[in-house]
């Protein structure tokens, strides 16, 4: 089969989607879907994720290069109570395990000139939708397989222009400290006469740290039975997905104290902004370049560069595309 130049360009453009990367490009308001990047700031990062080590940068606000497109990005006028959503580009879906959150930040004036350096507050979040007391699975995440995240503009939102930031965190590489962040910002103007006082207020960057236990989080071993969403609680004038508030039993202390050195596990809570103060070492994420690989060490997966064989009595088990482990 011969491919013309246009076909080759198209295949090249969707190649990141094949690897599981994606970008939020469309805004949806009361059921009406806008064009790609019509009201969402386009960024130079494209489909590529921001890794946990990079979330201390100012680019973590609306993504790399987004201010360059701010002036040409339109501002959508919405009323309090309007249903708003973000949709992924080119039919992609969220096939990375992890939570989703939406933040807002009021611009001091024209949102097109606003860099997001002010205060942010959370208006929505999605975590786990099933009882995970028997062990967390990829399909337990509320976002799994979806292409859209929707919420309602809180009724008491003060009028003015805002950045609205959607963020999905892929925890599939969290065991190695490389959780992936997918995020963009929309520009809106809220009408009405709302007099609410949004909060808790946070700064971006600063809302998370790379070493936070719910960011540097091992979803593979021991299999988690709880998870606490990162960041502040949802503003009381906002909405939190009630299906994500299922509580799971606390982590078994014996498992947490085993020789496996897991990432900290904390009680699942939709509104808690402070993870439980449980202490544990960071997970082992690499293996020798050759020779014998010890039990519970990584032995394969997409992007893994080590080599060797699992020690006697163990075998290399595939947990998912990115993580194989000697167990």
From Swiss-Prot:
Cofactor annotation remark: Binds 1 copper ion per subunit.
Cofactors that this protein relies on: Cu(2+)
**Sugar attachment sites:** 290
Q: What is its EC number?
A: 1.14.99.56
Source domain of life: Eukaryota
Q: Name one GO cellular component term.
A: extracellular region
Q: Which residues bind O2?
A: 172
User: What role is this protein assigned?
Assistant: Lytic polysaccharide monooxygenase (LPMO) that depolymerizes crystalline and amorphous polysaccharides via the oxidation of scissile alpha- or beta-(1-4)-glycosidic bonds, yielding C1 or C4 oxidation products. Catalysis by LPMOs requires the reduction of the active-site copper from Cu(II) to Cu(I) by a reducing agent and H(2)O(2) or O(2) as a cosubstrate.
Q: What is this protein called?
A: AA9 family lytic polysaccharide monooxygenase G
Per the UniProt record, the source organism is Aspergillus tamarii
């Amino acid at each position: 089969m011969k491919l013309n130049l246009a076909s080759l360009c198209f295949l090249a453009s969707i190649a990141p989607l094949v690897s599981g990367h994606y970008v939020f490009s469309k805004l949806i308001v009361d059921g009406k879907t806008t064009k790609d990047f019509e009201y969402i700031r386009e960024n130079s990062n494209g489909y590529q994720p921001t890794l946990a080590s990079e979330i201390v940068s100012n680019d973590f606000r609306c993504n790399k290069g987004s201010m360059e497109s701010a002036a040409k990005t339109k501002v959508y006028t919405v009323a309090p109570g309007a249903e708003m959503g973000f949709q992924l580009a080119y039919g992609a879906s969220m096939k990375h395990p992890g939570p989703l959150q939406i933040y807002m930040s009021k611009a001091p004036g024209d949102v097109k000139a606003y860099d997001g350096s002010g205060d942010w507050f959370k208006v929505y979040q999605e975590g786990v939708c099933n009882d995970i007391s028997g062990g967390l699975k990829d399909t337990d995440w509320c976002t799994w397989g979806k292409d859209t995240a929707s919420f309602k503009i809180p009724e008491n939102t003060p009028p003015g222009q805002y950045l609205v930031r959607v963020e999905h965190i892929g925890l599939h590489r969290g065991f190695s400290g490389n959780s992936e962040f997918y995020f963009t910002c929309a520009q809106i103007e809220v009408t009405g006469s709302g007099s609410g006082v949004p909060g808790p207020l946070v700064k971006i960057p600063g809302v998370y740290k790379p070493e936070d236990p719910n960011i540097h989080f091992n979803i593979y071993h021991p299999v988690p039975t709880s998870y606490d969403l990162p960041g502040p609680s949802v503003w009381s004038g906002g909405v939190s997905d009630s299906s994500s508030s299922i509580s799971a039993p606390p982590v078994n202390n014996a498992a947490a104290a085993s020789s496996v050195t897991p990432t900290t596990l904390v009680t699942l809570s939709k509104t808690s902004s402070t993870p439980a103060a449980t202490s544990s070492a960071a997970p082992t994420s690499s293996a020798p370049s050759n020779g014998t690989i010890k039990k519970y060490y990584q032995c394969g997966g997409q992007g893994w560069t080590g080599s060797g064989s699992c020690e006697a009595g163990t075998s290399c088990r595939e947990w998912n595309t990115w993580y194989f482990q000697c167990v």
